[in-house]
Protein backbone atom coordinates (compact mmCIF):
# COMPACT_ATOMS: atom_id res chain seq x y z
CA UNK A 1 0.00 0.00 0.00
CA UNK A 2 2.78 2.42 0.96
CA UNK A 3 4.58 1.53 -2.27
CA UNK A 4 1.45 2.35 -4.33
CA UNK A 5 1.16 5.79 -2.72
CA UNK A 6 4.82 6.52 -3.47
CA UNK A 7 4.34 5.47 -7.11
CA UNK A 8 1.29 7.75 -7.39
CA UNK A 9 3.21 10.74 -5.99
CA UNK A 10 6.20 10.11 -8.26
CA UNK A 11 3.93 9.78 -11.30
CA UNK A 12 2.13 12.98 -10.39
CA UNK A 13 5.42 14.84 -9.91
CA UNK A 14 6.67 13.67 -13.32
CA UNK A 15 3.39 14.65 -14.98
CA UNK A 16 3.38 18.14 -13.44
CA UNK A 17 7.06 18.68 -14.26
CA UNK A 18 6.62 17.57 -17.88
CA UNK A 19 3.62 19.87 -18.38
CA UNK A 20 5.60 22.86 -17.08
CA UNK A 21 8.63 21.88 -19.16
CA UNK A 22 6.46 21.65 -22.29
CA UNK A 23 5.26 25.22 -21.70
CA UNK A 24 8.77 26.54 -21.02
CA UNK A 25 10.09 26.56 -24.56
CA UNK A 26 12.07 29.74 -25.31
CA UNK A 27 12.06 28.97 -29.05
CA UNK A 28 8.32 29.58 -29.35
CA UNK A 29 7.31 33.18 -29.94
CA UNK A 30 4.90 34.48 -27.35
CA UNK A 31 2.17 37.01 -27.83
CA UNK A 32 0.70 39.07 -25.04
CA UNK A 33 -2.72 40.57 -25.67
CA UNK A 34 -3.72 43.66 -23.69
CA UNK A 35 -7.40 44.62 -23.86
CA UNK A 36 -8.12 48.26 -24.64
CA UNK A 37 -11.30 50.25 -24.75
CA UNK A 38 -10.30 52.50 -27.65
CA UNK A 39 -7.40 52.67 -30.08
CA UNK A 40 -4.33 54.61 -29.04
CA UNK A 41 -3.74 57.77 -31.05
CA UNK A 42 -0.68 58.01 -33.27
CA UNK A 43 1.09 60.18 -30.72
CA UNK A 44 0.95 57.83 -27.73
CA UNK A 45 -0.03 59.33 -24.37
CA UNK A 46 2.76 59.24 -21.81
CA UNK A 47 1.70 58.98 -18.19
CA UNK A 48 2.94 61.98 -16.18
CA UNK A 49 3.09 59.82 -13.05
CA UNK A 50 3.07 56.10 -12.29
CA UNK A 51 -0.58 56.00 -11.16
CA UNK A 52 -3.50 58.36 -11.70
CA UNK A 53 -6.30 59.67 -13.87
CA UNK A 54 -5.54 62.27 -16.54
CA UNK A 55 -7.52 64.26 -19.10
CA UNK A 56 -7.19 63.48 -22.77
CA UNK A 57 -5.60 66.68 -24.11
CA UNK A 58 -7.42 66.25 -27.45
CA UNK A 59 -10.93 65.24 -26.32
CA UNK A 60 -12.74 66.46 -23.18
CA UNK A 61 -15.04 63.40 -23.30
CA UNK A 62 -12.11 61.01 -22.78
CA UNK A 63 -9.45 60.40 -20.15
CA UNK A 64 -6.54 58.12 -19.33
CA UNK A 65 -5.99 55.78 -16.42
CA UNK A 66 -2.30 55.27 -15.69
CA UNK A 67 -1.19 52.19 -13.82
CA UNK A 68 2.49 51.38 -13.48
CA UNK A 69 3.28 53.82 -16.34
CA UNK A 70 0.81 52.08 -18.72
CA UNK A 71 -1.99 54.27 -20.08
CA UNK A 72 -5.50 52.98 -20.79
CA UNK A 73 -7.74 55.29 -22.84
CA UNK A 74 -11.33 55.54 -21.55
CA UNK A 75 -14.54 57.25 -22.66
CA UNK A 76 -16.75 59.27 -20.34
CA UNK A 77 -20.32 57.89 -20.33
CA UNK A 78 -23.09 59.70 -22.17
CA UNK A 79 -22.39 63.34 -22.84
CA UNK A 80 -20.21 63.84 -19.74
CA UNK A 81 -16.76 65.42 -19.74
CA UNK A 82 -13.63 64.63 -17.76
CA UNK A 83 -13.35 66.85 -14.68
CA UNK A 84 -9.67 67.12 -13.75
CA UNK A 85 -10.37 68.57 -10.28
CA UNK A 86 -12.76 65.78 -9.28
CA UNK A 87 -10.95 63.07 -11.30
CA UNK A 88 -14.25 61.80 -12.69
CA UNK A 89 -16.62 62.39 -15.58
CA UNK A 90 -19.29 64.99 -14.80
Swiss-Prot record:
Keywords: Allergen, Cytoplasmic vesicle, Disulfide bond, Endoplasmic reticulum, IgE-binding protein, Secreted, Signal. Residues 30-39 have a biased composition (Low complexity). Expressed in epithelial cells of the midgut. GO terms for molecular function: IgE binding. Non-allergenic peptides derived from the C-terminal IgE epitope-containing part might be used for immunotherapy to desensitize individuals with mite allergy. It is found in: Secreted; Endoplasmic reticulum; Cytoplasmic vesicle. Residues 44-90 form the Chitin-binding type-2 domain. Residues 1-21 form the signal peptide. One of its GO terms (cellular component) is endoplasmic reticulum. Residues 52-90 are annotated as: Important for IgE-binding. InterPro entries: Chitin-bd_dom (IPR002557), Chitin-bd_dom_sf (IPR036508). It holds the Pfam family CBM_14. Residues 22-42 are annotated as: Disordered. Disulfide bonds join 47-66, 76-89. Its main location: secreted. Does not bind chitin in vitro. Monomer. This is Major mite allergen Der p 23.
Amino acid sequence: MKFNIIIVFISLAILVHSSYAANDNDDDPTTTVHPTTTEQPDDKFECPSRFGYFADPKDPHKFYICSNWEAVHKDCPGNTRWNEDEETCT
